[in-house]
Amino acid sequence: MIGRLRFRLSKHFGAKNVLDDFALEVRGGEFVTFLGPSGCGKSTALNLLAGLLPPTSGEIWLDEERLDPRPPERRGFGMVFQNYALFPHLSVFDNVAFGLHVRRVTRATVADRVRRMLGLVKLDGLETRYPGQLSGGQQQRVAIARALVIEPRVLLLDEPLSNLDAKLRLEMRAEIKRLHQELGLTSIYVTHDQGEALSLSDRIVVMREGRVLQVGTPAEIHDRPRTVFVADFVGYRNLLPVTVTARGADGLVTAEGGGVRVRGRGDVALGASVLAAIRPEDVSLGDDLHGAGAARGTVRLVEYQGREYDVEITLDSGAIVKARTAATPKVGSVVGVTLDASRIVLLPAEDHV
């Protein structure tokens, strides 16, 4: 296992700054995810680490070795691509063995390592099949086996589950986590899916327009987003404009606006215009209108999600609140809405676009 991977990288395409002074240190054995929307620079960062793109400026260090001057094949990294990138004319065995042949590994060692890796990814018995004879999930397992068989110092995964259906995504997500833990890998994963990031990662790097907005554990990103963009991206679908009116000794901040009075957490100044961010699952519906965070509204939309319903309510003030509930409210009914103060995060409004 490596000690640490550290880098500081920038990348420009003409006048466009795709990656702006992206600096990070990854510890050996860590699973780090670059999370962000399309075009945020996350895949560019991964390609720079892999050596598939040259940086405009910056350095990559693995322990005491500088890697950025080296070609991809001399960095010791394994790469899993979004589109699998399997060779259609090669069998499963030969696809997995390809990197070992490039490294001139002996035939006996190749056979042993390929069979062991196919067993790890549960593809025993499929050695002679071709990619066109495999399901999407099986093709992805071949791609993962090919990246792992070279015993990479770092495993890079570029949105590897995006082409799979929902059921297969869940299965392969669990498989990737199992392999990471079982083999003691150091992994860097790219995705736009917050669910993947939260379930797989030791740390998450949230990115936007080539910049890092927040780095933290899944719990820190989920519970304590630092900006409105991060909050919105990881599921805080309610962003209510309010003004800070008081700070309590208990650490909670009181804010009011749009007919709503809320209490929540946040490093915000008295009198500041802020956004009260809260997830739909932390909004409850009922008749009780006592205390901060309570208001009355009318149900405008109900969407069935299996065990629960997504409900959109227009408050008497005109503000719109989204809730997730096990109850079955009717469109047009009047309900009480309560925002859980312990789950509200108050964030500066200036970065909301």
Regions found by a protein language model. Give the residues of each.
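ABC ATPase nucleotide-binding domain
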Residues: 25, 61, 336-338
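The feature captures the beta-strand-to-loop junction immediately N-terminal to the Walker
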Residues: 35-37
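Conserved ABC transporter NBD signature motif
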Residues: 58-66
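Helix-to-loop junction immediately C-terminal to a conserved catalytic motif
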Residues: 50
